[in-house]
């Protein structure tokens, strides 16, 4: 009893600490649940209203309908034909949709021993089987060796000479959207049609991120892989897309407050940006950025291992709000432990690289928003991800 009484303050402090973390976990669970409901409702409403979207004939004769340059970076991709079939089957005027496959020169020099030929040659063979009007929609470019890998491939596909061939010399970059899909993506055929309808309705944004589900190869995964596929897909639903939807709502709410109470808004703006703004998440596929915006950013970021996360931070630093795209896209989850480890290592390398980007952004513009992005990134990813890397193997994943 003497020992218990002597250590009472210690146990009380431990009780407070565990109560805090349990409360935090319960709050995060509630937020995630609300995020899942928000995204699911957003997607369900969009699919229920598909019949109200303008069809191909209307979009073909609408002068304000956007033009899409849809990029597919590829490297050793034997099953790329499935992605190209899905993209070329989009319900959008074929003269306003251009699919560009960007391969690497390294693959030509070192073909994969298990592939019958290179990815570029597979695409060319696939194109030869298409009708003439679809052949015109599909282009193949080969990026030389350089740092940046995927980002370099994407930027190479957007060179002026390539765009001039696709769009002509008098194209308006504000009416051109650059889409990105992985070589294992299966996008919904109504994706471009939904985006065009949003633009024509006056709601068009400079960038969009769509709902992605890592379920394309679900049947080929073992039980652990299926759990990871469901978990990763749930993160996209309850966090990534929900955050985009709610961020637009929060900023719109604050704009209304500023219009009604400008003095109050000016006083609380730093607190709002520091405590209530959230980072925008780009996933690297099923994303669209307006060409003029992408050019203003200097193209896809090449300084980090993950150009997608850096792109989201760069858009946020410039005050550009991304729109959520409700159409679904299925992608593969790595099917082997080796591929999964390499994917996660690349992601974490990108997390570390983004620390430098966010630090430079904050030093260049020391705003509460940029400070919040840096602090949250360090706390939520740089610190929590290594902990997860230790905990998951212990529990069997």
Predicted features along the sequence, with ranges:
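N-terminal membrane-anchoring/stem segments of glycan-assembly enzymes
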Residues: 1-60, 269, 380-387, 391
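Cell-envelope/extracellular polymer assembly enzymes that use nucleotide-activated donors
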Residues: 66-69, 98, 310
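A conserved hydrophobic helix/loop-capping motif in glycosyltransferases and polysaccharide synthases
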Residues: 68-76, 90, 102-104
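Short, acidic, metal-binding catalytic loop of nucleotide-sugar glycosyltransferases
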Residues: 85-96, 106
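Active-site-proximal specificity loops/subdomain of glycosyltransferases
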Residues: 110-175
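Long helical/loop segments within the catalytic core of UDP-sugar-dependent glycosyltransferases
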Residues: 127, 131-133, 149-167, 189-304, ...
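Short aromatic/hydrophobic "clamp" motif used to bind/position activated sugar donors
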Residues: 178
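Catalytic donor-sugar/metal-binding loop of nucleotide-sugar-dependent glycosyltransferases
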Residues: 303, 312-330
């Amino acid at each position: 009893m003497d020992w218990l009484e002597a250590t009472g303050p210690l146990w009380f402090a431990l009780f407070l600490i565990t109560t805090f973390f349990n409360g935090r976990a319960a709050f995060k669970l509630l937020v995630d649940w609300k995020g899942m409901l928000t995204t699911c409702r957003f997607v369900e409403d969009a699919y229920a209203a598909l019949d109200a979207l303008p069809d191909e004939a209307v979009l073909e004769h609408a002068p304000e309908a956007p033009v899409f340059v849809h990029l597919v970076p590829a490297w050793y991709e034997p099953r790329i034909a499935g992605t190209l079939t899905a993209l070329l089957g989009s319900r959008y005027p074929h003269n306003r949709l251009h699919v560009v496959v960007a391969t690497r020169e390294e693959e030509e020099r070192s073909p994969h021993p298990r592939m019958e030929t290179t990815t570029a040659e597979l695409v060319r063979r696939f194109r030869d089987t298409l009708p003439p009007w679809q052949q015109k929609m599909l282009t193949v470019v080969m990026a030389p060796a350089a740092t940046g890998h995927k980002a370099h491939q994407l930027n190479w596909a957007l060179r002026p000479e390539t765009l001039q061939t696709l769009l002509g010399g008098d194209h308006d970059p504000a009416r051109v959207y650059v889409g990105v899909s992985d070589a294992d993506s299966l996008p919904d055929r109504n994706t471009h049609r939904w985006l065009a309808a949003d633009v024509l309705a006056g709601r068009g944004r400079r960038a969009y991120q769509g709902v992605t589900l890592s379920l394309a190869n679900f049947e080929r995964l073992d039980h652990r892989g299926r759990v990871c596929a469901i978990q990763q897909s749930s993160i996209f639903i309850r966090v990534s897309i929900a955050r985009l939807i709610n961020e637009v709502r929060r900023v719109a709410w604050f704009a209304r407050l500023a219009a009604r109470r400008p003095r109050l808004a000016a006083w609380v703006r730093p607190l709002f940006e520091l405590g209530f703004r959230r980072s925008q998440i780009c996933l690297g596929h099923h994303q669209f950025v307006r060409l003029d915006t992408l050019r203003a950013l200097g193209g896809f970021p090449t300084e980090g291992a993950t150009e997608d996360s850096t792109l989201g931070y760069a858009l946020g630093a410039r005050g550009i709000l991304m729109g959520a795209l409700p159409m679904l896209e299925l992608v593969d989850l790595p099917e082997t432990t080796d591929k999964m480890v390499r994917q996660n290592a690349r992601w974490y390398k990108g997390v570390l690289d983004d620390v430098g980007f966010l630090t430079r952004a904050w030093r260049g513009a020391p705003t509460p928003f940029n400070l919040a992005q840096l602090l949250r990134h360090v706390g939520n990813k740089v610190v929590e991800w290594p902990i997860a890397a230790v905990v998951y193997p212990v529990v069997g994943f």
